């Protein structure tokens, strides 16, 4: 009998609840934490959107498209009904981060900026950066097409020179792609993983990115490998996660791309159809800010 991939996530949560080290953290909430975890999710004919609770699929999709656009303005995402970056872009949060001179919503040179304009001088979220810095994402796609056996198929959001200007340094900071047998796989290194809220989102987001890059390069999705550094459960998520652990995984949904897309910048939210997603009910959890 094949074990459902979702059990890897659930088993990590169990391990943290049973044996995690009690640690303080930036938010003041406190965590239980373990260091070093790996899980592998097959993308063949399925999409790893967790089923033991409902995951906000539209939020996953819109956030990734926002990254791909190179945007650093949380207001742009919020206007699409996705509020997941609102707290980190608030006037109060920016002031506490030493960035009180910024307009609310200006997150600094975070994920999308590093993916599309690595090395450019950051001014603000309204500036047009076209032609500035290294477009890692476009270069990555081109290299997969030209040299699929390359060991340099890397995309990074971690730029030490820019960290002080970011509202929040990247948690999911580096991924590497790998081509074999006509399939594209992706391995993500995540320095900090919030098991209750963030990690289910991150699994889906990088799996979606793998589907998109595979589509553009004429490959099939293979595996998503997720490596976590500090894997933690916030103390106010312990009881909600205990509820989640009582539930059995259901079949993963399938993801279809509905039209032929030729350029990474041409993807739209309506290009994706998630089919057969029948999860357990949502479990409310407060985000630690």
Curated annotation (Swiss-Prot):
NCBIfam families: PRK01827.1-3 (NF002497), thym_sym (TIGR03284). The active site is at 171 (nucleophile). This is Thymidylate synthase. The keyword Glycoprotein does not apply. PROSITE patterns: THYMIDYLATE_SYNTHASE. It comes from the Viruses. (6R)-5,10-methylene-5,6,7,8-tetrahydrofolate binds at residues 194, 288. Pathway: Pyrimidine metabolism; dTTP biosynthesis. It catalyses: dUMP + (6R)-5,10-methylene-5,6,7,8-tetrahydrofolate = 7,8-dihydrofolate + dTMP. SUPFAM superfamilies: Thymidylate synthase/dCMP hydroxymethylase (SSF55831). It holds the Pfam family Thymidylat_synt. Homodimer. DUMP binds at residues 26, 151-152, 191-194, 202, 232-234. CDD domains: TS_Pyrimidine_HMase. It comes from Equine herpesvirus 2 (strain 86/87) (EHV-2). Belongs to the thymidylate synthase family. Keywords: Methyltransferase, Nucleotide biosynthesis, Transferase. The lineage of its organism: Viruses, Duplodnaviria, Heunggongvirae, Peploviricota, Herviviricetes. GO terms for biological process: dTMP biosynthetic process; dTTP biosynthetic process; methylation. GO terms for molecular function: thymidylate synthase activity. Its EC number is 2.1.1.45. The keyword Electron transport does not apply.
């Amino acid at each position: 009998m094949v074990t459902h991939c979702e059990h890897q996530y659930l088993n990590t949560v169990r391990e943290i609840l049973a044996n995690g080290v009690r640690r303080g953290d930036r938010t003041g909430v406190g965590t239980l934490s373990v260091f070093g975890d790996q899980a592998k999710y097959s993308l063949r004919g399925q999409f790893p959107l967790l089923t033991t609770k409902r995951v906000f699929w539209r939020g996953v999709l819109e956030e990734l498209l926002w990254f791909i656009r190179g945007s650093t303005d949380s207001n742009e995402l919020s206007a699409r009904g996705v509020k997941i970056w609102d707290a980190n872009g608030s006037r109060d949060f920016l002031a506490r981060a030493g960035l009180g001179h910024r307009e609310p919503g200006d997150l600094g040179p975070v994920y999308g900026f590093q993916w599309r304009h690595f090395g450019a001088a950051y001014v603000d979220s309204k500036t047009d950066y076209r032609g500035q810095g290294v477009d890692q994402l476009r270069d990555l796609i081109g290299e997969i097409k030209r040299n699929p056996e390359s060991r340099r198929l890397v995309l990074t959001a971690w730029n030490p020179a820019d960290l002080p200007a970011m509202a929040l340094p990247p948690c999911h900071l580096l991924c590497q792609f790998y081509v074999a047998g006509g399939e594209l796989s992706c391995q993500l290194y995540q320095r900090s993983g919030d098991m209750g809220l963030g990690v289910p989102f991150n699994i889906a987001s990088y799996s979606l990115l793998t589907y998109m890059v595979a589509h553009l390069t004429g490959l099939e999705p293979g595996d998503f490998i997720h490596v976590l550094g500090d894997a933690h459960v916030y103390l106010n998520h312990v009881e909600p996660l205990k509820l989640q652990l009582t539930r059995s995984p259901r079949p993963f949904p399938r993801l279809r791309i509905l039209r032929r897309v030729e350029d990474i910048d041409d993807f739209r939210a309506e290009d994706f159809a998630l089919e057969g997603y029948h999860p357990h009910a949502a479990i409310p959890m407060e985000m630690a800010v």
